[in-house]
Swiss-Prot record:
GO terms for cellular component: cytosol; RQC complex. The keyword Transferase does not apply. Component of the ribosome quality control complex (RQC), composed of the E3 ubiquitin ligase rkr1/ltn1, rqc1 and mtr1/rqc2, as well as cdc48 and its ubiquitin-binding cofactors. RQC forms a stable complex with 60S ribosomal subunits. The modification Phosphoserine is found at S56, S61, S63, S110, S111. Coiled coil: none annotated. This is Ribosome quality control complex subunit 1. Residues 51-63, 102-122 have a biased composition (Basic and acidic residues). Residues 17-32 have a biased composition (Acidic residues). Component of the ribosome quality control complex (RQC), a ribosome-associated complex that mediates ubiquitination and extraction of incompletely synthesized nascent chains for proteasomal degradation. Within the RQC complex, rqc1 is essential for the recruitment of cdc48 to incompletely synthesized nascent polypeptides that are ubiquitinated by rkr1/ltn1. Belongs to the TCF25 family.
Length: 656
């Protein structure tokens, strides 16, 4: 019998017992009323007597047929079915008004039959339960063997999972941003309490009714943001759930951008201020004016302008843009994306002056996950912010990730910071000493300047010096920005103990770079620290550094940069020389050679450019094909505009 049938049988049995209890109560009530009260003649009593007589005769005949059969325990003398049980209940209900003696006899007989039926049903239930338990045991044995097979298969499958995928998942977890901690007001309130809040209760309630923002909270007095001209689109998604985004610009925004670039070349701040009044959420204008105001000493207004630019980005975030996943990507090679990088970095600088180290730390994680190539070299400073915020466990986990992915050599600062974090967590232990010694031995070029900053002397042996500009920069930056975390007296005593008691073996680390890498150079420009600018290559120092786009990468994905950086420079240089020579010719009133008049002016210029520049750029871009089309349309439109003017002049002369 199935478990469903057993449950159904149990429900029926419970229903029968409940109805019998109700019937017995009603019978007792009837008996009490019949004995205590005066007997009342019922008109239906005659019919009931006749029915009782017929039923008694039927029961008597059935009992006579079964007299010869012996009674066995557990068997019922009457074949009981659900239908018969229901009929008996109906009969009982019809016989409520019968005589007391007859009702007692029928009730006794019915109770005996029900007891026998209960014994039989309980025996059947026990048999069915035994069968179910036996079947369950067989199934358990079967599925246990199947689970063992699946477990072995799962172990084999997990062993085949690529290590790179596991590392990527670990990195995404490490770079996941706590969205609530991107609000510096929450951090300040947590440190100093609500007493620092100057807003009224009504103002706080008004802010609660506003839209929840991710990057920055809008401030009172800002102009309303209707349409900034910016947008964000999802450009792709990888199998590892990485979402790639691109910030888009409308045609009107691009026209404002062209105006901004023209005003920058005029070196007149008033033009930028005028542009900012008419377009209060143009990103490059906000950043440029913010830098000018910061140089004048108004740091609060400068930070407010940067926050306004970040608010413009916050208003266009894509629904799939989720910094908490650690897998949000904004390729740095796209020029429009670089504005968000720069805006966040400028915002971080203002937060550092307020001591909001947790907010700075969370924004650094966002910059790291935007582009895994780390264009701002955040890996060289995020550990310093984590130390200030006492995120020791995160530093140790991130250093382990870099070690497992063979990237620790690019960020030697993580060797020192992870060892320091272990000391803060575990104290002076064997593992902590081993970690600190490993940092000294693997990156000894950083030790000398750090010890000098901490006023610690080491005379056992000479400390190796940096062997290339990259090692020099790492040593200088870490000693400059991490000294506060190493200045604790317990840390100084720990370092002195290691240098005096432990055997420290230091060797030179071979240099690999003749000059700073592009990312490190960009970081030096962003830091704007005069003591570090000496490490920049001369080609960068002698070139033009744009504050609104510092050191853009060599590869552009924008339509306005189709020729490439090298070709654009060479074309611009040639055109400048060409125009200078033409100006000198006009001043000297010398006529060009006769053969130059055989070709149209555009063709002359194109031939000279082709001889100077070449047909293709370094990456194989067909420059001259596009340039010929451009010059052809340019000169055609120019001729079409000048011809009607000449005709009108002739008509005017004829009219005169």
């Amino acid at each position: 019998m199935s478990s469903r049938a057993l449950r159904k049988l149990q429900r029926q049995r419970q229903t029968e017992l409940l109805e019998e209890a109700l019937d017995s109560e009603s019978d007792e009530d009837d008996e009490f009323s019949s004995t205590s009260g005066k007997k009342v003649v019922n008109v239906f009593e005659i019919l009931e007597k006749e029915n009782n007589a017929i039923n008694s005769e039927a029961e008597k005949s059935v009992s006579e047929e079964e007299q010869d059969e012996p009674l066995v325990e557990g068997e019922s003398p009457i074949v009981s079915t659900n239908k018969k049980a229901k009929n008996k209940k109906k009969k009982k209900k019809q016989q409520k008004k019968k005589k007391v003696t007859g009702k007692r006899d029928l009730d006794n007989q019915s109770s005996d039959n029900e007891k026998l039926e209960g014994l039989e049903s309980s025996k059947n239930i026990d048999d069915d339960i035994d069968e179910i338990e036996k079947a369950a045991a067989e199934l358990k044995l079967k599925y246990r063997e199947q689970d063992q097979v699946e477990h072995v298969a799962g172990v084999e499958e997990s062993a085949t999972i690529p290590l790179d995928k596991e590392l990527d998942e670990k990195l995404n977890k490490l770079l996941g941003v706590n969205i609530s901690m991107l609000n510096p007001d929450l951090e300040i309130r947590k440190i100093f309490g609500r007493i620092v809040e100057k807003r009224s209760v009504n103002a706080r309630h008004d802010n609660l009714r506003r839209k929840r923002h991710v990057l920055v909270q809008p401030q009172e007095g800002w102009p309303p943001l209707v349409r900034s001209g910016l947008g964000m689109k999802l450009t792709g998604q990888s199998q590892d759930l990485e979402c790639f985004f691109e910030i888009t610009q409308s045609r009107a925004y691009q026209e404002v951008q062209e105006t901004f670039e023209y005003y920058v070349q005029t070196y007149d701040p008033n033009n930028l201020l005028m542009l900012l009044r008419s377009h209060p959420f143009h990103i490059d204008t906000l950043l440029q004016v913010s830098e000018i105001i910061d140089q004048q000493g108004d740091h609060e207004l400068s930070a407010e302008l940067v926050a306004r630019g970040l608010y413009a980005f916050d208003s266009i975030l894509h629904p799939r843009f989720n910094l908490a996943t650690g897998a949000t990507r904004l390729p740095f090679a796209i020029p429009s994306n670089r504005r968000l990088f720069l805006c966040i970095w400028r915002y971080l600088q203002s937060l550092q002056s307020r001591g909001c180290w947790r907010t700075v730390f969370e924004f650094c994680k966002a910059l790291l996950q935007f582009d895994m190539s780390d264009p701002y070299a955040i890996g060289t400073c995020i550990d310093i912010y984590a130390l200030r915020r006492r995120e020791f466990a995160w530093i140790i986990d991130f250093a382990n990730y870099l070690e497992n992915s063979n990237k620790i050599s690019d960020t030697p600062n993580m060797l020192y910071s992870s060892a320091l974090a272990m000391f803060y967590v575990h104290g002076d232990t064997t593992d902590t000493r081993a970690s600190m010694l490993a940092a000294f031995e693997r990156a000894p070029y950083m030790l000398s300047e750090l010890l000098d900053t901490l006023n610690i002397s080491f005379t056992k042996s000479s400390i190796p010096s940096p062997q290339d500009p990259v090692q020099e920069l790492h040593s200088a930056m870490y000693a400059l920005y991490a000294k506060d975390s190493w200045s604790d007296p317990t840390v100084l005593a720990f370092i002195n103990s290691i240098l005096e008691k432990e055997t420290v073996t230091l060797h030179d680390v071979e240099g690999q770079f003749a000059e700073l890498t592009e990312n490190l150079s960009r970081r030096v420009i962003l830091l704007n620290e005069q003591s570090l600018r000496k490490f920049l290559p001369q080609r960068i120092l002698q070139g033009t550094i744009l504050s609104f786009d510092p050191l853009p990468p060599d590869t552009y994905l924008s339509e306005s940069q189709v020729f490439g950086r090298d070709i654009s420079r060479r074309i611009a240089s040639f055109l400048s020389d060409y125009l200078s020579r033409a100006r000198e010719v006009n001043e000297n009133e010398e006529e060009p050679p006769a053969h130059e008049f055989d070709l149209p002016p555009a063709e002359q210029l194109l031939q000279q450019i082709e001889s100077e520049v070449g047909e293709e750029s370094e990456d194989g871009t067909p420059v001259m094909t596009r340039l010929r089309s451009f010059f052809g349309s340019l000169f055609t439109s120019t001729n079409s505009e000048t011809e009607p003017a000449e005709e009108s002049t002739e008509e005017m002369g004829q009219g005169d």
